[in-house]
Amino acid sequence: MYRSSNPVLRNQAFAGQTVGQEQMTVNGTINKILTLFMCILFGALVTWAVAESNPGLAILLTGVGGFGGFIMCLVIIFSRPAQPGTMMGIYAILEGFFLGGFTLIMESMYPGIAMQAGMGTICVFGVMFMIYRFEIIKPTERFMIGVSSAMGAVFLIYLLSFFLSFAGMGIPFLHSSGPVGILISLVFIGIAALMLIVDFGVIEAGVKNKAPASMEWWGAFGLTITLIWVYIEMVRLISKLRNN
């Protein structure tokens, strides 16, 4: 059985199907991924449309999307609904609100950055998929534990930075545009890219183990979260580079 330390893609959920259930497929998982990205696009378009007439409301939507998406993500992970499609769709729309506002703000400061970050994200996805396909990096249990631990460390760093900001403080170099700040962004992108290997591996294992079809949503959910992370880190890196 394929083992995973990823809290979104728990290994026992992908262990196999019971008699009579539809089973997980690659095409089904791709369809779920496309569905979630359509929800993200819808949320982003709503924020962009609102920003044209009411910038203040667009900023509110961005905040609601960011906070609400984070809470919804935690609810989904810890409640483990048997049919998670609706909740994951809501999560994706909330993330769309946030990403739409985030992209507008960054685009106003750095024209063209959205396209650059989008292309960068696609390139990272493509490269990591090829690395996975040719088994240059294999998602072994030790690899997955290491990458998931690194991801958790990044999350704690950002969470600490968020709380410190209320006291007018911050983590040194995290948001700086100097060499150290750029290196930090590169490391974070590297960790996010390695998480794609984990996502690919768990999805493939779910298909091979004939996991229930509902697991397609979980595979799509994990991959979507990782791609959102890659995009945000790519925007941060490009903004730092363009500040120099």
Label each residue range with its predicted role:
Residues 1-244:
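A hydrophobic alpha-helical transmembrane-helix feature that marks the membrane cores
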